[in-house]
């Protein structure tokens, strides 16, 4: 796209070294990679490959030891802790394997939480949260508590919460790890829709090849380096896969 030639995520020879007493662990060894606005990228690799460290740096939860990380053109190393927290809240939506919902709080209130930190007023908070829940197919469930929702529905609330501040990027770390295969594909259908219809950049960490298959691009880490990076030639469309899968009763869509 013409005006979007600058990458949203830019890693320039990024190293990350952890000092564990007398031992130094080289988690990232000179990573250079660009992710452009509107991409849907799966990050793969074995445990200890560097993929989690990469995600932590992308999400401004950690900083490079050497090298540069630019997020939307901003050099993250130059930011204060407070500025980093603001960026995490406004520019990045996080989705994890564990849903991290507040149990005594409704789906709507859980979704609203990031807007409270962003300083939005009540009415706008409600509107944004309702819109986000609608996008993930949870209209009519706004006042349900997490205990009244299935695992897949709870993960949808977590995605709505990640969307509510209209972030530039969604970072999803093993988001289907706790879900059965049918529900996992439903979640991937939401990510594909958000990516295609709303242009949201999605970076997804997974160790499952059948989940990475829904991304447009796959980056494979090994020993702190990128071993493979390229378009996903055999990309699956979740809406085509869903009808072929058996459903579990509690995950079936309600009759219209």
Locations of regions flagged by a protein language model:
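ABC family nucleotide-binding domain
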Residues: 7-221, 226
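Conserved beta-strand-loop-alpha-helix hinge in the C-terminal portion
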Residues: 225-253
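Pre-NBD coupling/linker segments of ABC/ABC-like ATPases
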Residues: 1-3
């Amino acid at each position: 796209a013409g005006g979007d030639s600058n990458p949203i995520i830019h890693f320039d020879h990024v190293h990350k070294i952890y000092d564990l007493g007398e031992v130094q662990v080289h988690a990232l060894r000179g990573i250079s990679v660009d992710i452009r606005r509107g991409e849907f990228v799966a990050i793969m690799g074995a445990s200890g490959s560097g993929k989690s460290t990469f995600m932590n740096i992308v999400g401004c939860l950690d900083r490079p030891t050497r090298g540069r990380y630019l997020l939307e053109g901003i050099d993250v190393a130059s930011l204060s802790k407070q500025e980093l927290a603001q960026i995490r809240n406004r520019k990045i939506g996080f989705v994890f394997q564990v849903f991290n919902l507040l149990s005594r709080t409704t789906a709507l209130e859980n979704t609203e939480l990031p807007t409270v930190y962003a300083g939005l007023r009540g009415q706008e908070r409600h509107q944004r949260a309702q819109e986000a829940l609608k996008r993930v197919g949870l209209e009519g469930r706004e006042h349900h508590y997490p205990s009244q929702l299935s695992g897949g529905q709870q993960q949808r609330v977590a995605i709505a919460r990640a969307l509510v501040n209209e972030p530039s990027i969604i970072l999803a770390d093993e988001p289907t790890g706790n879900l059965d295969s049918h529900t996992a594909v439903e979640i991937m259908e939401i990510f594909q829709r958000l990516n295609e219809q709303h242009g949201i950049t999605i970076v997804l960490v997974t160790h499952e090849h059948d989940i990475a298959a829904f991304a447009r691009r796959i980056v494979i880490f090994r020993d702190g380096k990128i071993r493979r990076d390229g378009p996903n030639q055999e990309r699956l469309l979740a809406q085509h896969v869903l009808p072929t899968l058996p459903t579990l009763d509690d995950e079936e869509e309600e009759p219209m």
